Amino acid sequence: MGSSRAPWMGRVGGHGMMALLLAGLLLPGTLAKSIGTFSDPCKDPTRITSPNDPCLTGKGDSSGFSSYSGSSSSGSSISSARSSGGGSSGSSSGSSIAQGGSAGSFKPGTGYSQVSYSSGSGSSLQGASGSSQLGSSSSHSGNSGSHSGSSSSHSSSSSSFQFSSSSFQVGNGSALPTNDNSYRGILNPSQPGQSSSSSQTFGVSSSGQSVSSNQRPCSSDIPDSPCSGGPIVSHSGPYIPSSHSVSGGQRPVVVVVDQHGSGAPGVVQGPPCSNGGLPGKPCPPITSVDKSYGGYEVVGGSSDSYLVPGMTYSKGKIYPVGYFTKENPVKGSPGVPSFAAGPPISEGKYFSSNPIIPSQSAASSAIAFQPVGTGGVQLCGGGSTGSKGPCSPSSSRVPSSSSISSSSGLPYHPCGSASQSPCSPPGTGSFSSSSSSQSSGKIILQPCGSKSSSSGHPCMSVSSLTLTGGPDGSPHPDPSAGAKPCGSSSAGKIPCRSIRDILAQVKPLGPQLADPEVFLPQGELLNSP
């Protein structure tokens, strides 16, 4: 009896050991998922989201480790590093980063900022996290990110994230500090040249490393999902690259910014609105950023349109890179925040998603999406018949031998009395930026003036020899760039479009503007539709 039981017990014991072994391998992932379910930060209404928030791309959590999904059987590998005060690298307990599947890792509220991106199986990711001790840096060594069966790759040499004063550049975008002294990166999406591809390329470090993630194009029926803006501008490296190529998209993007009335945590408190306004109402349109209080938040946009360079889409909103919100104020320099894309957008100002883009070797060129109808715009010409369409200012910045052609093949004429479209003389319409590399090479879309007979055509300030903008490589200003908020002062002079009309046409994302009257000049009433 005993001799016949021994083999059976041995077989049972073998199966039992195998079951225990399988359970031991599967338990960590299951436990991670279960803990993520028990304390789900995605249901927290106060949660600060990012373009690649795991609540949008997958499942994340705010505990000591991130959830794991997917499989590494396809040959993908992930190298992660974590530090809590310096540059020490290595994986700490439970600091795994989701790989292969759809899960990402982003953990506000813990003092850490996981910068990781999810892509299809077979691609390799690298994530790094570190505490936001100013002046310190956390780096991650790239243990070669191998992959098989995937078109996305990551060049895994050593890179580091520098935490400095109030903001830092992460490739094409900038990082924004959260209220818990951690940083989150909002990266500028750049589209590969193929218009049929929906793969997004995000710059991760200034050395040119990138992580590719497959994101579907924006769709109005998926309002809370990260997406690419469709074919936009392809570039890598610094925020304003050395050259651009437009692979599609001509429709306008409407961006409406709401200035919150109250001050934000970590920012010097001030009056409800920097320039007046009634209690309980949104602040009137803003014209500058030299205020030490308040915040600006994008509250409108269109997923039917393509994103402009420097903007990203998340949670039903279009965010300009480098912007801050009331819930996510800029720390370190509350007086004058740092912006990656110039000054903030004034309320009710509209922009063209198809800007005229310089093509030159210098990386110092910048694109300024100038709000229409704002200061610095001067009219030129007396309205006599002459050239139609945009004109370029006659200045030393535009050599006489420059070849500037419109989409119809006609050259852009210098701004003057013979032009039917107004212009901005040299030295006006420029913007200041925190980056010294963006001090020259500005191209600014300006509105049509009072003497314009071809309303809606913006003027441009040119500082490069060759301009590209349309899908065919020719300049193609968007007529809607000449629109401004309606008011009695603009009747018969400058074309205007009410915010209500704009938002009704573009199917806005995010909350509707409940009180469009605040965007009109003080004392004017909105005409009933």
Curated annotation (Swiss-Prot):
Q: Which residues are glycosylated?
A: N172
UniProt-recorded Gene Ontology molecular function terms: protein homodimerization activity
Q: What is the effect of changing N527D?
A: In allele 1.11, allele 1.21, allele 1.31, allele 1.32, allele 1.41, allele 1.42, allele 1.43, allele 1.51, allele 1.52 and allele 2.11
What tissues contain this protein?
Exclusively expressed in skin.
Q: Where is the composition biased (Low complexity)?
A: 58-83, 90-100, 111-175, 189-231, 392-408, 426-441
Write down any Gene Ontology CC term.
Answer: extracellular region
Tell me the impact of changing L410S: In allele 1.11, allele 1.21, allele 1.31, allele 1.32, allele 1.41, allele 1.42, allele 1.43, allele 1.51 and allele 1.52
Signal sequence extent: 1-32
> Main subcellular localization, coarse class?
secreted
What InterPro entries does the record tag this protein with? Corneodesmosin (IPR026087)
Q: Where is the composition biased (Polar residues)?
A: 449-467
Query: What are the GO BP annotations of this UniProt entry?
Result: amyloid fibril formation; cell adhesion; cell-cell adhesion; corneocyte desquamation; epidermis development; keratinocyte differentiation; negative regulation of cornification; skin morphogenesis
Q: Which UniProt keywords apply?
A: Glycoprotein, Hypotrichosis, Secreted, Signal
Region Disordered, as annotated, extends over 38-248, 383-492
Reply yes or no: does the keyword Secreted apply: yes
The listed locations are:
Secreted
Report the function annotation for this chain: Important for the epidermal barrier integrity.
Q: Which disorder is it connected to?
A: Hypotrichosis 2: A condition characterized by the presence of less than the normal amount of hair. Affected individuals have normal hair in early childhood but experience progressive hair loss limited to the scalp beginning in the middle of the first decade and almost complete baldness by the third decade. Body hair, beard, eyebrows, axillary hair, teeth, and nails develop normally. HYPT2 inheritance is autosomal dominant. Peeling skin syndrome 1: A genodermatosis characterized by generalized, continuous shedding of the outer layers of the epidermis. Two main PSS subtypes have been suggested. Patients with non-inflammatory PSS (type A) manifest white scaling, with painless and easy removal of the skin, irritation when in contact with water, dust and sand, and no history of erythema, pruritis or atopy. Inflammatory PSS (type B) is associated with generalized erythema, pruritus and atopy.
Please identify the protein, giving its name as recorded.
Answer: Corneodesmosin
Native organism: Homo sapiens (Human)
